[in-house]
Amino acid sequence: MKFNFLLIFTLFITQFFCAQNKYEKETRIDKADFPENAYSLLETHLENARRIRFYKEIDSTKQSFEVKFKKRKLHYSVEFDPQGTLEDVEFEIDVVDIPEDNWMTIENYLKSNHNKYRVKKIQQQHPTLTDENPKETLRKAFQNLILPEINYEIIFSAKTEKGFQAYEALFNSVGKLITLRKSYPPNYDHILY
């Protein structure tokens, strides 16, 4: 009994600490390897899109499929789970696209928790709500609506004692931190010299 408790406790703690770091591997795949139901849901939104690419993504917490493309001068990323269920729609934005008060809240968090930082990328995220039709999520995302349920994903690097560390932070629509993970580059052990 004591052993089972220790085993479960150890597994829980390991999972908790691993979830704080992001080890991501993104592999480009053919359209044929992309979930068919996911593609059919997204197909009408891909009209007039350029640079359409399909990916399989494995990170420290999950596996997913992603399609990336450019449409109306915006870089989109639409993510699905392995069953083809829509998870979220993201597109790159600039600081000026975030309401000023909300950006000030985000910036205050960054300044108070990191001595020196540099924002590398900002994405507006439209997550699929549990009671919402995925088609509605896509409609809202492609109309670029600023809604209370959107999030901002900010990728930045910050100075630490050992140099610079990359982070991925997720903030809600008013600038409150939801998650913060250290982000590590892909492992290149497979490259032989």
Residue ranges, per PLM feature:
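A short, surface-exposed beta-strand/turn
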Residues: 76-88, 163-185
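Phosphate-end processing signature that detects enzymes handling 5′-triphosphorylated RNA
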Residues: 23-24, 40, 66-68, 95-100, ...
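Short glycine-rich, low-complexity/disordered patches
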Residues: 50-58, 116-132
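Long, charged/polar, surface-exposed segments that mediate recognition or autoinhibition
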Residues: 82-126
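Eukaryotic scaffold repeat domains enriched in small/polar residues
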Residues: 46, 93, 99, 111, ...
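Bacterial Sec-dependent N-terminal signal peptides
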Residues: 1-25, 42
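Exposed beta-strand-loop-beta-strand "reactive/processing" segments of non-cytosolic proteins
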Residues: 46-79, 136-170
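Start-of-domain marker
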Residues: 21-65
